[in-house]
Amino acid sequence: MISLGAVAINKKGDNFGDFEINLAPMENSVSDPVTMDWFNSEAPDALNYCTKNQIPPKEAMNQFGDWLLKLPSPRIMAAHPAPIDFAWVNYYFLEFLHDRLDKYPFHEPFFQVMPAFDIKSYAARVLQKDYADINRNNYPIELHNNKNHTHKAIDDAREYASLLVKLLNI
């Protein structure tokens, strides 16, 4: 993970803050060539953006943890698709914040509900579609215009936060 973006919202769409940070690669890590080829061809601006101003992962995750603790409760991670994003964030929490997690079951106080809320699954239910048929390119335009999907973590977080608020209020 080289970039992390998060938006704190409630059902009404009130924004409690945004968080964005670029992480330096983990020690002894190796980039996945398929992922890098995809970013270089599909989202080179996002790749260029997230490789600037990188900070060590432990420092980045501590900053993220500090930001989370300032937010009102309950804090529930939501993502699209959650199984992928949650896996990365959870791994980095365990790897770099284990000293802050030992005394808290299920990663509290960072998130009160684990694992993450899957926006894609919720959208499938609300829109009465099969999960496999749900993606950012086929949402009704009134829910999601897809023009802000830059693959920069913060832009995508804002985009999916907006989608979630709309879905929660259908």
Language-model segment annotations:
Residues P57-F64, D85-Y92, P115-I119:
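Amphipathic alpha-helical interface surfaces
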Residues Y104-A132:
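Short, flexible loop segments at boundaries between secondary-structure elements
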Residues D37-E42, Q128-N137:
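A structural motif
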Residues P83-M114:
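Substrate-recognition/cap helix-loop segment adjacent to the acidic, metal-dependent catalytic center
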Residues M1-A82:
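Conserved non-catalytic scaffold segment of RNase H-like nuclease domains
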Residues I76-M77, A87-W88, N135-I170:
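Acidic, Mg2+-coordinating catalytic module of metal-dependent nucleases/exonucleases
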